[in-house]
Amino acid sequence: MTNNLSGYRNKFVRVKTSRKRTVSSNNWLRRQLNDPYVAKARTQGFRSRAAYKLLEIHEKFKLFTPNMKIVDLGAAPGGWSQIASKLIKASDNSLNNKIISIDLLEIRPIVGVEFFQKDFFEEDTEKLIIQALDGKANIVMSDMASNTIGHKATDHIRTLLLCEQALEFALKVLKPSGHFIAKIFRGGAENKLLNKVKHEFRTVKHFKPLSSRSESTEIYLVALNKK
């Protein structure tokens, strides 16, 4: 699994406007049709281009090894769970080498992944995850983001709140020396969150994968070795 895009950069595809589509929908479709990572994901059988973001994070920080328990928050359509399953060599009958995935949207089965179609913020979901883990997690990862509205400050705050919730959960279920990965949007309000993360983990890094669109303000918070 590599991020080499040779052969995936196609000739620019124009999108015909339609009265049934909004301007933002047309822009999204144009990006999708001309995105080499979308084409590569389709060819290699990954659920989404986000799979390459996690792969790049792993290549940079060497996070995943066999015999891990992982929680994937906001998992649909399953790109991150797919990558994690391959990296830890997960299997459906292993108790100590598995991934627990949560999302409101359904995802198709993935080897070694136990999926719950639940709202992460419902009161009983946390108990359900903890029960399924049957112990502490090595990694909690979250690619959750709120539905963007195009207002950068609002999108920043909404996704930051999701990250804060994911962090609170991670601190409950991670083993000592466990890792936390989460998406945030840059915007200036993240300092309080970063200070808390730095207090709880030995190493905290920001990382923007090459597979993250250049115009996007998203970055990934990579917190290593929980104290």
Swiss-Prot record:
Keywords: Cytoplasm, Methyltransferase, rRNA processing, S-adenosyl-L-methionine, Transferase. Transmembrane segments: none annotated. Gene3D superfamilies: Vaccinia Virus protein VP39 (3.40.50.150). It holds the Pfam family FtsJ. GO terms for molecular function: rRNA (uridine-2'-O-)-methyltransferase activity. It is an enzyme of class 2 (transferase). This is Ribosomal RNA large subunit methyltransferase E. The gene is rlmE.
